[in-house]
Amino acid sequence: MKKHSPVEITYFGIQAYTGTTKHMGGLASTQELIELCGIGEGMHVLDVGCGVGATAAFLVQQHGCRVTGIDRSEGMIERAHQRANAEGIQDQVVFKTGDVQDLPFAAEEFDATISESVLTFVADKAAAIAELARVTKPGGQVGLNEETWLKPPPTEMITYTHNTWQIEHDLPESGKWQSWMVAAGLRDVRSKLLAFDSTREGTQVFRYRWRDMWLMMVRSLDLYLSNSEFRKYVKARRRLPKGLFDYLGYGLYVGRK
């Protein structure tokens, strides 16, 4: 197995090490977001918070797009390059590190811009959405899949999301996400609010090849057996608060530049 950078025992550090990223709704929500954004063959798409490159690969292979992916994690970008090379799509994708609140791109560069479970973790969500709008061409769509409180949560659930998923900034409800998109100058803003669904979540695995899944399991097991800090991390986060997903869901938010 190719040696990877030393693992950070953090929510994103673990994902980068194992080679897996996820968002609520899995591949089913990715496909729905693509359809809502009208993404199709020949389009140049920006995938903000691209993680290990699973959505980028899907856009290239299933929709004939060119994709630029950006992520703040060097470990994620390393895995994304590995995936692109393994799947023979390295000529259709570009991956680089960067900050969603200050994107390293010219204005009006992309036909569409998407973000899946990324802005949830960003301090200034309004500024980030404004950046997504800035780099999107006129008439292009900006699409988000982001965690959303379905109703005001009790304190214990806010604490759990902060401690488990390292969501350091308050999650908004649906109306706030939409208002930020309007403030960024996006038009025809629409949203679809979704509750946790185990069947839909099961489509996470379809974002990966069987070899990827095997490597993820091997890396996870190796980390669990060899790293006491990781074992403590898992133990402390094993139990979900009762009724969490009565409160926590996600929304698909789309607006036109």
Q: Predicted segments — roles?
A:
Residues H23-E41:
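Conserved alpha-helix/loop element of class I SAM-dependent methyltransferases that forms part
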Residues L46-V48, V52-D102:
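Class I SAM-dependent methyltransferase SAM/SAH-binding core
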Residues Q101-A112:
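A short acidic, Gly/Pro-enriched loop at the edge of an enzyme's catalytic core
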Residues A112-D124:
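A short SAM/SAH-binding and catalytic strip from SAM-dependent methyltransferases
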Residues A126-Q141:
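A short glycine-rich, Lys/Arg-flanked "PGG" loop and its adjoining helix->strand segment in the class I
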Residues E147-E168:
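Short, glycine-/aromatic-enriched active-site segment of Class I SAM-dependent methyltransferases
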Residues D170-A184:
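Short alpha-helix
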Residues R190-K257:
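Conserved Class I S-adenosyl-L-methionine
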